Curated annotation (Swiss-Prot):
Residues 114-431 form the Kinesin motor domain. Residues 88-97 have a biased composition (Pro residues). One of its GO terms (biological process) is microtubule-based movement. It is found in: Plastid, Chloroplast. Residues 59-69 have a biased composition (Gly residues). PROSITE patterns: KINESIN_MOTOR_1, KINESIN_MOTOR_2, ZF_RING_2. Residues 1-48 form a transit peptide. GO terms for molecular function: ATP binding; ATP hydrolysis activity; microtubule binding; microtubule motor activity; zinc ion binding. It comes from Oryza sativa subsp. japonica. ATP binds at G194, V195, T196, S197, S198, G199, K200, T201. This is Kinesin-like protein KIN-7K, chloroplastic. Its main location: plastid.
Amino acid sequence: MSSRPSSSASSRRSSSPFSAGSRRPPTSSSSSAGSYLTGRLMPRSYSTASSVSSSSHFFGGGGGSGGGSRSTTPGRRGSSSSSLVGPVPSPPSPVPFPSAEELVIEDTSRSGDSISVTIRFRPLSEREIQRGDEISWYADGERLVRCEYNPATAYGYDRVFGPKTTTEAVYDVAARPVVKGAMEGINGTVFAYGVTSSGKTHTMHGDQNCPGIIPLAIKDVFSLIQDTPGREFLLRVSYLEIYNEVINDLLDPTGQNLRVREDAQGTYVEGIKEEVVLSPGHALSFIAAGEEHRHVGSNNFNLFSSRSHTIFTLMIESSAHGDEYDGVMYSQLNLIDLAGSESSKTETTGLRRREGSYINKSLLTLGTVIGKLSEGRATHIPYRDSKLTRLLQSSLSGHGHVSLICTITPASSNMEETHNTLKFASRAKRVEIYAARNRMIDEKSLIKKYQREISSLKQELDQLRRGLIGGASQEEIMILRQQLEEGQVKMQSRLEEEEEAKAALMSRIQRLTKLILVSTKNNIPALTDTSSHQRHNSVNEEDKVSTSQDSSMLVQNDSATKDSLSSASPDAVDEINQLRCASGDHSSIAGSGPDEMQGGITASDQMDLLIEQVKMLAGEIAFGTSSLKRLIEQSIEDPEGTKNQIDNLEREIREKRRHMRALEQKLMESGEASVANASMMDMQQTITKLTAQCSEKAFELELRSADNRVLQEQLQQKNVEINELQEKVLRLEQQLTTNTEASPEQCTEHELHDLKSKLQLKEAESEKLKYEHMKITEENRELVNQNSTLCEEVAYAKELASSAAVELKNLAEEVTKLSVQNAKQAKELLIAQELAHSRVPGRKGRSAGRGRDEVGTWSLDLEDMKMELQARKQREAALEAALAEKEHLEEEYKKKFDEAKKKELSLENDLAGMWVLVAKLKRGALGISDLNVDDRSINLADITNGTKENKADKNVAVVEKQLSDNTVKSLTAEEYRNPEFEPLLVRLKAKIQEMKEKETDSLGDKDGNSHVCKVCFESATAAVLLPCRHFCLCKPCSLACSECPLCRTRIADRIITFT
């Protein structure tokens, strides 16, 4: 869980990017060639006047549209839909901006309504201005968003708001129609979407100076209740968050990891806490309490960034009065504050990165759902891939009004993120909805349940009053008093309990009546009894409580009352309770008579009204005090900006406390006056009330006596059954005694002896099992230790085997090279032999022919013929010598090939011996434990690097000395005690020495300057080893090795190069 700071919603809202001033950058951008689509920025030159206008606060201006934020270019007209304009025109021709008619062609052809999509720009923040960001997107009129660098790229929406637009203007366009539809029984959803630090939370919640969508919607709901005569409303709220795909109840901190369920009306959260609200202040207090438990965190863009999605749900039930009753209408108003999507620019790590991944996953699923809904095809829609889309399934599927508010930043650094938000809004605009009113079955209607209970309780009171005379004479009063005194002795014990039950009944009627909010314009005659004046109080509170800032419904539930009174002065609360108890015996009962309806508000009504006023003021003082604390905490960062707010809050709190003290004084005076001026009619009504209570209690006593008779009959039946069971038990005991007397005592002793012997056997077995358990535990411990050592030895043997395999591979390559070379030499030898054989007959033939020709023509000179013959013999001898030399070379190559074959066979035998050794080590035999870790790494590197053959003899003595030292060091007494492994170890160490000599030769000759990896001999070297700085390994081998193959220095770090 992330840390939850104690700062509330107001401190977080004021630190949002909307509160930053919009100063102009010091320099203006210059035009450049290219376009946005080709990847090069093409900012237009703009002046300070034509760019985003400066303001001291984001909500300081009064413009409602986005057109005032910058001057419009000729040819730019507003539009109402969303569509991406086509290709970029050629540079020589003027840019043909699309018109509003072109952008709404697609939307006008659809039959159903669509999601309402509005765009809200925020100004450049201080950080963006200092960083030199420019305006990349801007509002072109009231319906278009256009790209600064490519004016042909434009999107059309229902409304576009510039940086100077207030939240109230956004609410009037985006949220007010949804709220009105919810009051008429149509479900509604309003949610803000955008990247992090774009102003979503500020738009939805706002602050003290400028409230957001949620406070404005709550205020609008209660104002619509006041303006709707003839209907009764019941309002409930719930507040939840989705943090890391886990649903938490913000109104109940214990409600964690709640589950989503589904019924006929849609999806709902199981176990969510719902609170009945009766005023805007009451609802806002729940929001403030929930914000204290919401997950927030800091990133590069925002100090208090939302780390979870929140859904504030307002459930509205309404029905008409009396004969005009047409059923109960039920609707839900969802006000959603989504967490911002995050990119790599936030540079979050650890928990923040994990939170961001969950946020991006849920928003990606939301985008996928919107995209599939906008296509209009019957495809699978992945609502269940995220908790957010699962809860929004009913809203997104078209069963209510949906309003999407996309908050975007015009900064060029967030150009791509803003473009993605605009494309998401464009897809959402194409989703069709078909909203309809909801009707609720009476059995599931909470307001109807309260009404039925109230009517039943009122019928009971009417039955109690029936037959009583409204006015009585003094004689009748005295008779009644005497009768009461006579019956008081018998009913005293029962009367106290019945008084408590009666008080609970009256308080329930009062509380249920308060929960039903009625308009002040309702002209229907008031109902009788206590519910009439309570409803009158709940309706006319705005006129009576003139000093209270909350000008809506007055009544709060009991839990909220206790919480609000706890923040007031304890002495005042005690005095109020004492006065109410003192006057409650007279004035509370007197208010239920028939004269109350004619005479207006009684003393009890006045005291109740004063008490409720004190409660409301105490709650407002507590809320103002918490807001003042948050502002004081925030003033550390911005003391000048919050000083005025702190002064205003302190002034309001002092005024409310002074007004509360005046009300407490008035309440004390009215209580004393009510006690002193109790009239005779109040006494008569009290007597009639007590008489009715006595008759009621007598009736209940008769009922209980009847119940007692039934219980006595059941008790008698149970007594009969108990007697029968007791008789059975006695018979069984007698049979048991007879059986025990008949059995001899010797049998008992024999059984005892058997039991003792069995017990001894069990004890012996348990001891044996304990001993075996201890033995097995020790063996297990030894086996674990032996297994660890064997694992180390097996790992070392595997390393040796892998290095031997590499050596075999290299030798196979060398054998292949030698065979190829041998083949070439054989071919050359055959060619030379053919030439030699072909020249001798040719010469002889040519000489014979020539002789015959010469004999035929003239006589040859013998001396010349001898000289020619001698020369030919010399050439023949030279060719024979060359042929002999080639044969000698061929024999040498054959010898080398045979040696390589033998060497390969020897290595294969060594490898097989090592695998045999590994197998023996695994079976628990003695291992080669004398080779330490350093020798193993050295031997492994020696085997790996000793693959190239060279004839140089440099550094042989040094290598032999080092190898002999290592060999002496590795020999231990354990080896001498195990002669079975001595031949194998001798062969292995001889092989290591041979590999060492080869490695020394290769380092001394050409491998010292080679750029081939010294381990795999395949890849080029690409890593500089530290601290030895040798450039001798490729990247994979450098990561696998722990020591340098050249100098045996332990590798601390690597520098990977790409050559």
